[in-house]
């Protein structure tokens, strides 16, 4: 590489400042225009990447979220052409569904009728069935690293794509790590500068790949990421209209790390700032391509470079051909969904139980909308008609962040779409009335005890990481691990442990209670009123109201948070449920609510609970604070909870290769043992199978067997005159369920690129950043194969969410018209929008509500 020429080009591109208002000459004006166009292309490419949350806050995300402004088939074409990524289900999988009768001829015919493009092009059922015998004819556009991979030694080494991905990935792992390495890298100059410095001092890849001039070429790179971006785009010589597409394709080669950087940008946006890491990653990955071109500067590489330019000049036509070719895949996707909708319509058209009169309800239980709550809600109502269950987002409307006692481990407990506005901390409070001084003494002694234990643990762990301890520590302390080894060889059957109490002496655990801090009485009353109204609990309250969050139980599971509550940002719902119960049981808050016309009867008590979704047990908290009458009701409820839990465990047993006829105590023991087994890769199925979201009164689905595939959110349009609650539901929980649905969809349709691979091979990166499959490659995002496949068959069907709302048409239309994000999801085919209607159902199609009758299915 010619250093003088590179510097000259960099100078030419940076002579005109980005904010210059009056270029001095026409040449300056052209340079400014070029600079702006390049920056816009880079920004557009970066905006196409969806965020991926870290392991300890893992929530489901639609990996195509940043592209939902386009119709789903257009996105499918772009992902296939730019990244070799499959969006629709594989044709082989659809062929199996067709041959097994899962998709019927009637389903296929109806799909062809529902898709206007299929009607316009005259697509036939015969064309669709014949197409299943072959793959979609979609060609992926090459990148510079691909066309340069043409030397005679290419079969004896890693491909350039593999080698570069590995090098960039290892660099990112070192740079972003804040939890594993004791010696942290210098990050002050940014990711791009760190990579450039690393590559200059690491001669291994140059020797391994046969690039002796790599070090000199790296030294000649521009020092700033922005200059590197402009230098590469200028060197590539591609037409300006395809810049953003090429840059997006480049980012897709390191999609895992790009998604991590997008997460950093997302968090920065919530805090009102910007983050440069994704742009720097783009500059790194761009620079690598041109480094190869400069190092291989021969006739073959120049010919390959010309091939690249020809291919990308035809990129718009390639994308359009791909979109046309994928029409048949969209037809089959819809046909698969119609097959499910046929069953859903038949079940919802005739609810099994109309409900119980309000005066007969003795207990109300508010569950998360999670699909795993549906079987337990159904079982509870079947076991005892005196219980009414409700569905609400599992964070219970509390925009909180939680910091456990005597720690600085602050974490969000709300959906990833939102930023926390309220802090929750632990208070150590005994049930018996004590003075403020006594409570303060308890708080202080508990804090000191925990800090001492945590400090001792940290010293022990630090000692085990000393370089000199590699052998001596194992020999001296190895025997202490025999107990843990024994637990792994024979897992125990204890109930779920509460990680938030780690390091806290047992005498304080029962009285360590999370509570909201920093709110005056007016703020508490206002928050309580909003939550009660949104939950539909502003009237007709039962004597006992359970606030049931949920959490999972597993051992040795890097993705454990992904099985917890997504609405609580990958945490259990315990903190939110306990904080809200404390708020609503506060007599001063209740008095303030009466001033707003909200009367919580004196005989009503709220109890915080947690649904263990792995074992289907329900645990309650702060029972020592309950009044005698409420405690008596809770104790009387235990046989109902036990019977309902056993019923759900038997329903789930076959999917876990367990015998549903096993005696109830033995079956619970088996599930607990699985939950505590460090070798168990499938402790539960999470949200696999999710396919529908009902926003409606419980009477619409009470007694209906929905198979744990439906999100259920209670909503009463008669109590929402201004439509504000519906607007909230369609812009928050509906978006969250869409994210969940599409993460499962994407990880099933393309497990290699949008899934995290084989869980057995996972190695955690940076403590909480994510995982590698093996010891290298890109950071893996999405769900593992074991979360979706039981070894014989897929446990998740890749269906787009069918949202069924019981609300006036005008109210739904108003939300769609007001919120672009909702309009894009509905109009772009990212989900199905249905509405309950007197004669059955109607569905939203291109701005028109079309009748859906049971007879159609």
Spans of features found by a protein language model:
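Conserved catalytic alpha/beta cores of large enzymes that bind or transform nucleotide phosphates
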Residues: 428-456, 589-624, 734-782
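Short, glycine-/Ser/Thr-/acidic-enriched flexible segments
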Residues: 371-373, 402, 551-553, 698-701, ...
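Compositionally biased, intrinsically disordered low-complexity segments enriched
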Residues: 4-16
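Generic recognition of flexible, low-complexity loop/linker segments
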Residues: 350-356, 531-536, 543, 676-683, ...
């Amino acid at each position: 590489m010619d250093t003088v020429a590179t510097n000259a080009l960099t100078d030419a591109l940076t002579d005109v400042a980005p904010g210059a208002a009056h270029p001095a000459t026409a040449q300056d004006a052209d340079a400014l225009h070029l600079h702006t166009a390049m920056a816009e292309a880079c920004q557009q490419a970066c905006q196409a990447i969806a965020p991926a949350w870290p392991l300890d806050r893992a929530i489901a995300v639609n990996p195509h979220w940043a592209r939902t402004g386009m119709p789903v088939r257009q996105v499918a074409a772009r992902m296939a052409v730019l990244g070799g990524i499959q969006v629709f289900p594989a044709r082989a999988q659809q062929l199996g569904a067709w041959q097994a009768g899962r998709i019927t001829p009637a389903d296929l015919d109806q799909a062809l009728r529902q898709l206007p493009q299929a009607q316009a092009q005259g697509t036939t059922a015969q064309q669709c069935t014949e197409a299943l015998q072959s793959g979609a004819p979609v060609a992926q556009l090459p990148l510079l690293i691909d066309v340069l991979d043409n030397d005679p030694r290419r079969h004896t080494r890693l491909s350039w794509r593999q080698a570069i991905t590995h090098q960039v990935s290892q660099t990112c792992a070192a740079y972003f790590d804040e939890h594993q390495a004791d010696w942290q890298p210098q990050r002050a100059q940014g990711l791009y500068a760190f990579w450039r410095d690393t590559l200059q001092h690491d001669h291994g890849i140059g020797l391994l790949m046969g690039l002796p001039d790599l070090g000199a070429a790296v030294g000649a790179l521009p020092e700033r990421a922005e200059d590197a971006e402009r230098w590469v785009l200028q060197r590539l010589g591609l037409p300006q209209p395809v810049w953003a597409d090429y840059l997006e394709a480049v980012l897709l080669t390191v999609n895992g790390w790009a998604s991590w950087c997008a997460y950093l940008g997302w968090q920065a946006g919530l805090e009102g700032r910007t983050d440069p890491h994704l742009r720097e990653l783009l500059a790194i990955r761009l620079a690598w391509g041109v480094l190869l071109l400069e190092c291989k500067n021969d006739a073959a590489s120049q010919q390959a470079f010309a091939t690249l330019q020809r291919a990308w000049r035809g990129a718009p036509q390639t994308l359009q051909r791909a979109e046309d070719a994928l029409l048949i895949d969209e037809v089959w996707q819809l046909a698969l969904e119609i097959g499910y909708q046929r069953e859903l319509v038949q079940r919802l058209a005739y609810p099994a139980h109309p409900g119980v009169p309000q005066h007969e309800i003795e207990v109300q239980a508010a569950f998360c909308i999670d699909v795993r709550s549906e079987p337990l809600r159904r079982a509870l109502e079947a076991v005892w008609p005196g219980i009414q269950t409700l569905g609400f987002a599992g964070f219970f409307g509390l925009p909180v962040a939680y910091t456990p006692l005597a720690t600085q481990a602050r974490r969000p407990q709300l959906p990833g779409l939102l930023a926390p506005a309220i802090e929750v901390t632990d208070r150590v409070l005994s049930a018996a009335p004590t003075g403020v001084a006594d409570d303060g003494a308890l708080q202080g002694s508990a804090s000191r005890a925990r800090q001492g234990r945590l400090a001792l643990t940290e010293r022990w762990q630090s000692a085990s990481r000393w370089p000199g301890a590699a052998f001596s520590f194992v020999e001296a302390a190895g025997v202490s691990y025999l107990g843990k080894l024994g637990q792994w060889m024979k897992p125990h059957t204890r109930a779920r442990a509460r990680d938030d109490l780690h390091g806290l002496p047992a005498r304080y655990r029962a009285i360590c209670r999370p509570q909201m801090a920093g709110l005056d009485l007016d703020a508490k009353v206002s928050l309580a009123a909003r939550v009660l109204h949104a939950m539909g609990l502003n009237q007709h309250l039962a004597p006992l109201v359970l606030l049931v969050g949920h959490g999972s139980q597993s051992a040795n599971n890097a993705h454990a948070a992904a099985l917890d509550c997504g609405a609580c940002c990958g945490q259990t719902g315990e903190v939110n449920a306990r904080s809200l119960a404390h708020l609503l049981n506060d007599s001063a808050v209740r008095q303030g609510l009466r001033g707003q016309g909200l009367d919580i009867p004196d005989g009503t008590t709220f109890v915080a609970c947690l649904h263990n979704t792995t074992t289907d047990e329900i645990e309650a908290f702060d029972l020592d604070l309950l009044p005698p009458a409420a405690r008596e009701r809770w104790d009387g409820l235990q046989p109902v909870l036990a019977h309902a839990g056993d019923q759900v465990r038997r329903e789930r047993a076959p999917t876990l290769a367990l015998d549903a006829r096993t005696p109830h105590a033995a079956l619970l023991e088996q599930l607990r043992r699985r939950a505590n087994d460090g070798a168990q890769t499938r402790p539960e199925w999470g949200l696999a199978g999710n396919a529908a979201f009902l926003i409606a009164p419980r009477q619409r689905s009470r007694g209906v067997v929905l198979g744990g595939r439906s999100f259920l959110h209670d909503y009463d349009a008669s109590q929402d005159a201004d439509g504000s609650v519906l607007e909230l539901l369609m812009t928050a929980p509906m978006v969250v369920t869409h994210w969940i649905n599409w993460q499962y969809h994407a990880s099933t349709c393309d497990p290699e690129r949008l899934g995290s691979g084989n869980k057995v091979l996972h190695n955690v990166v940076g403590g909480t950043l994510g995982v590698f499959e093996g010891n290298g490659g890109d950071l893996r995002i999405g769900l593992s194969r074991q979360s979706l496949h039981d070894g014989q068959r897929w446990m998740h069907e890749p269906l787009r969410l069918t949202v069924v709302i019981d609300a006036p048409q005008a109210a739904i239309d108003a939300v769609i018209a007001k919120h672009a994000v909702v309009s894009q999801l509905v109009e772009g085919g990212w989900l199905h929008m249905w509405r309950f209607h007197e004669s059955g159902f109607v569905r939203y199609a291109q701005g028109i509500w079309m009748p859906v009758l049971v007879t159609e299915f």
